[in-house]
């Protein structure tokens, strides 16, 4: 058997046991894990430091290194996230609908686990813990394949998960880490249809596209955030500038950070001037990659290429497009959007409603930063990712997104005539 076949077989077996765990047992184990992760802080930080040194040696940008880096506060935040998942209502066994049909059959539609989840993700090591917590709470086994940049951190965290399961008398193979980070093994995981029920990629555009093209397992597409903010001619310009600065600069390396700015021509001069003024006042610097009209109005700008409009920069860089009309803004955003999060800043209620209806994205904002697209903020607890597709799940994926449904039919001897 191949390495992936062994992992898959182990996961399939473990999925049978975790599916039967009571809510109380799952919550107790999750709380044990949270305590154990905090207790293992020094070990985890030591391993994380190895990843950080390696990343710097490989010339990875400081913004991307920040995604990788852990500290005591971030480890405590990881533990707090586990506690929050433990406190959430368990969807497994929840009755979605129930009725008695004309034949006297009692039909219940219940939430059940998906089975075995595989996740391929990039640098952030906290993803491994979030993914396990949600998968475990919903009675699923999970196979984690993180990026090579975080292999030491992920190994330390998964070892803690497996030890917690073993110490509580449960199968540690409920969670497994693919320790071989080669592309060959990743592609083998994408073909493991006999063992894996769903594959969730979380990372950049290249990773997502590779998984979509090569996976034979059903895929839930997540992550890529080519996010836009449209400044309408009826916008409060001061509020608009504050929102853009927050959405771009608070944490530019995350998928809900704004990447594209679309501005109505009627207020472009005043707004862009206000934006640059407020950036200077807040000691922030953003490189604007602008179209011809915006280029004449901005101080810190270079001419945009066509590819810039479709790029998730994950940096202090932002594309700028000036449009002649509200309708052109919607058309532009729908052309370049990755269907993650989009926003309009306007005091025109009719335009706000039309924008929310017509823009094709999982989350559409009016007069607010796109940085709020997050499982915790939406009240879902931790998230396994933000789905940018329409089938099965869309937007931040919490517990319910990791379940399926099953019909339970009870009769008293009925046969079909």
UniProtKB/Swiss-Prot annotation:
- Enumerate the Pfam families for this protein: Aldedh
The lineage's top-level taxon is Bacteria
Kindly list the places in or outside the cell where this protein is found, as annotated in its UniProt entry.
Answer: Cytoplasm
Q: In which pathway does it act?
A: Amino-acid biosynthesis; L-proline biosynthesis; L-glutamate 5-semialdehyde from L-glutamate: step 2/2
Do the record's keywords include Cytoplasm? yes
EC category:
oxidoreductase
Q: Which UniProt keywords apply?
A: Amino-acid biosynthesis, Cytoplasm, NADP, Oxidoreductase, Proline biosynthesis
Entry GO terms, CC: cytoplasm
Q: List the catalytic activities from the record.
A: L-glutamate 5-semialdehyde + phosphate + NADP(+) = L-glutamyl 5-phosphate + NADPH + H(+)
Entry's Gene Ontology molecular function annotations: glutamate-5-semialdehyde dehydrogenase activity; NADP binding
Function of the molecule:
Catalyzes the NADPH-dependent reduction of L-glutamate 5-phosphate into L-glutamate 5-semialdehyde and phosphate. The product spontaneously undergoes cyclization to form 1-pyrroline-5-carboxylate.
* PANTHER family per UniProt: DELTA-1-PYRROLINE-5-CARBOXYLATE SYNTHASE, GLUTAMATE SEMIALDEHYDE DEHYDROGENASE
Protein name according to UniProt: Gamma-glutamyl phosphate reductase
Which gene specifies this protein's sequence? proA
